[in-house]
Design a protein with these regions (language model features):
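Solvent-exposed, flexible loop/coil residues
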Residues: 34-39, 46, 88, 132, ...
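Nucleic-acid nuclease catalytic cores
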Residues: 92-93, 100-185, 197-203
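Metal-dependent nuclease catalytic cores that hydrolyze phosphodiester bonds in DNA/RNA
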Residues: 1-110, 212-215, 219-225
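Non-catalytic C-terminal interaction segments of nucleic acid-processing enzymes
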Residues: 6-7, 168-225
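Short, charged low-complexity intrinsically disordered segments located at boundaries
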Residues: 60-64, 70-74, 160-168, 200-213
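Generic marker of residues within folded, mature protein domains
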Residues: 87, 138-140, 189
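Structural motif
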Residues: 20-30, 124-125, 187-194
Length: 225
């Protein structure tokens, strides 16, 4: 089914055909990588974690969602904290919510819902994470998942995300990049930008210090030349 979906969408993945279970990476690693490859390496290579107010609020929100149990109606079934994985993409994780909507022919159409504490981000990291969940569900259930939803705590409403060809391609490319980063087993050097100020890893990463050292080395080299 996954092959048919890719063929219809015109995507040409360069990913290995199948990953071993032991080689799967967390879906959250894709989001970390898109935000900052160094952050991804700190979490998934060096096994570091730093929590601030934002990550704590996000963790509490997810814990509330995951303990909600199950919900069932005549045309809707809701599963919480659903384990998912894709051997093609080499990823695994847990979906906050998967809604199954009854279709006219009697089949159930899954719709993944991811909860976020803040507001929509300027980058695609949340959309990529959600689409990765959908591609896992497609591979596991042998169906097509055309869209999902992001629920942001500050807005208190859902944002529908359509899983088009471009977004799916980004998921595949990001998954491949994450596997490459982890296989290299090295942490990229820090690069400071405005996003660093809200990152929980700021005290550990120290991007400003590293940037100042680079400038100092450059000026020293210019003087000595």
């Amino acid at each position: 089914m996954t092959e048919r979906i890719l063929e219809q969408s015109g995507l040409q993945p360069s990913l290995p055909r199948l990953y071993d279970e032991d080689d799967l990476v967390m879906i959250s690693a894709l989001q970390h990588y898109l935000f900052c490859p160094r952050r991804c390496a700190l979490v998934h290579i060096e096994q570091q974690w730093q929590e601030n107010r934002f990550t704590a609020e996000g963790r509490i929100l997810h814990e509330r969602v995951h303990t909600a149990g199950k919900e069932s109606r005549r045309t809707l079934r809701v599963e919480y904290d659903v384990p998912i994985r894709s051997l093609r993409l080499g990823i695994a994780g847990r979906a906050d919510i998967v809604e199954f909507h009854l279709q006219e022919g009697g089949s159930w159409l899954p719709l993944p819902v991811e909860y976020k504490r803040g507001r929509p981000k300027k980058d695609d990291s949340d959309r990529v994470q959600l689409c990765a969940q959908a591609m896992c569900l497609e591979e596991m259930l042998g169906c097509t998942v055309p869209e999902g939803a992001l629920y942001y705590g500050e807005k208190k409403r859902r944002t529908i995300v359509v899983f088009d060809s471009a977004l799916r391609q980004t998921v595949m490319e990001t998954a491949e990049s994450v596997h490459g980063l982890l296989a290299a087993d090295g942490t990229p050097p820090p690069r400071y930008d405005s996003r660093c100020e809200s990152c929980s890893f700021l005290p550990l990463c120290l991007p400003k210090v590293a940037t100042k050292k680079k400038v100092a080395r450059y000026l020293r080299a210019m003087v000595e030349a």
